[in-house]
Amino acid sequence: MDIDPYKEFGASVELLSFLPSDFFPSVRDLLDTATALYRDALESPEHCTPHHTALRHVCLCWGDLMNLATWVGTNLEDQASRDLVVSYVNTNMGLKFRQLLWFHISCLTFGRDLVLEYLVSFGVWIRTPPAYRPSNAPILSTLPETTVVRQRGRTIRRRTPSPRRRRSQSPRRRRSQSRESQC
């Protein structure tokens, strides 16, 4: 079964894969952040949002994985095998948990649309050859200040006057000034 945990939120595993693995904070830091910001909502018996629900599930699954890791560490006598299990969990499963935690915390903090916009912006930035892209990657917390959102549909272009014609001081100009004063 190929299940994408981001699908219902408008994202995908592929979209998050553009972010390098060292981009994501540690699971411990992310869990501390989730607890500090959303403890009441996460512990509440009431349904808040799908992101809260997903965050609850990720936290519970991480707890179960840590219980399994503790059991393996206690019951596996061969140190080399123990190290292999720990390495596998940290490399593969740890990254998935860090991505999930980061995504849902970010969506709750910044809003889903902004996080998706950030993921797309970063994906475009990282795939652009270094010679043609800005030196700094997009930053999620500053995205609203720097992003130009273009609305779909036909854009209206103003024609600039040709250099041969001088713009006359016609009544049209005075009308536009009077419109401004009505606002």
UniProtKB/Swiss-Prot annotation:
Record-linked Gene3D superfamilies: Viral capsid, core domain supefamily, Hepatitis B virus
Each Sequence repeat, start to end: 162-169, 170-177
SUPFAM superfamilies: Hepatitis B viral capsid (hbcag)
Post-translational modification: Phosphorylated by host SRPK1, SRPK2, and maybe protein kinase C or GAPDH. Phosphorylation is critical for pregenomic RNA packaging. Protein kinase C phosphorylation is stimulated by HBx protein and may play a role in transport of the viral genome to the nucleus at the late step during the viral replication cycle.
Region 2 X 8 AA repeats of S-P-R-R-R-[PR]-S-Q, annotated ranges: 162-177
A GO cellular-component term linked to this record: T=4 icosahedral viral capsid
Ranges for region RNA binding: 177-183
HAMAP family in alphabetical order: HBV_HBEAG (MF_04076)
Protein name: Capsid protein
